[in-house]
Amino acid sequence: MIDDVDTAFENARTFIAHFAPDLVVMFAPDHYNGVYYDLMPPFCIGAAAQSVGDYGTEAGPLDVDRDAAYTVAREVLSSGVDVAFSERMHVDHGFAQALQLLVGSITAVPTVPIFINSVAEPLGPVSRVRLLGEAVGRAAANLDKRVLFVGSGGLSHDPPVPQFATAPAEVKEKLIDGRNPTEAERNAREKRVIDAGRDFAAGVATIAPLNPQWDRTLLDVLASGYLEQVDSWTNESFVEQAGHSSHEVRTWIAAYAAMSVAGKYRVTSTFYREIPEWIAGFGITTAVSIDE
């Protein structure tokens, strides 16, 4: 399985190297490492961003294109999509891991990081995510750059991420403001997730199962280009069919919606595996505009 994933990433890296982007616009979630309930926006664009370095990812500042970030933010706001804006965004493996695996490091290519809340209820309708992506796509079209859109997040999965409504008081406080954990606290948290993955693979975990059929349906919808189909998907249906963290596919929807602004596109590769050890339906796709 690891060899298959490594090959899929190598193919994606080759695709990106051939495209040679001037800018990466990345849509990604957070896992209560950078954004908390003390102020939880549905979307946030970063003009500067710092990776916290969780799960062994690279820590430190991303190479953020501030001018492009401001341009994107203005277009999104003028399109009627309310988006937060940050000059000091903190991001986790949702951003950093994808950048490292796809382009080599968090500073390899200038980036505009766009956070999409995918775990902290209440969540907005999926249609707003699509509209966000389209607005970002319109902004990118005016940048005079070769722009790579990346959506980073799991497919069906239900890892042990606490839900605010049911969490004990001490956990709620961490969800409200758990910034700057000690190394021991971060290690313990990551160990809980890794242990849950082992239990899940062994069939003894009490979390929701993966749903390959749901995952493949989503990938088919994204490949079809008819993204309005997701507008009818309720937030509850995500959780019921694919687990609480399946909302991370909002990043995929936004990335494909951004690409759709340039016209029809073609998916050039699709990789999918059901990986219980990672508590995730795992996918990698690449796509190009028909005119590319």
Predicted regions span which residues?
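Beta-strand elements within well-structured catalytic alpha/beta cores of enzymes
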Residues: 22-28, 114, 145-155
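Non-transmembrane, aqueous-exposed alpha-helical and coiled segments at domain scale
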Residues: 134-142, 147
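Glycine-centered flexibility sites
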Residues: 133, 151-153, 281
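Short active-site-proximal "capping" loops at secondary-structure junctions
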Residues: 30-33
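Phosphate/ribose-phosphate-bearing ligand recognition and processing surfaces
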Residues: 154-163
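Flexible, D/E/H-enriched segments
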Residues: 1-21, 37-131, 142, 162-292
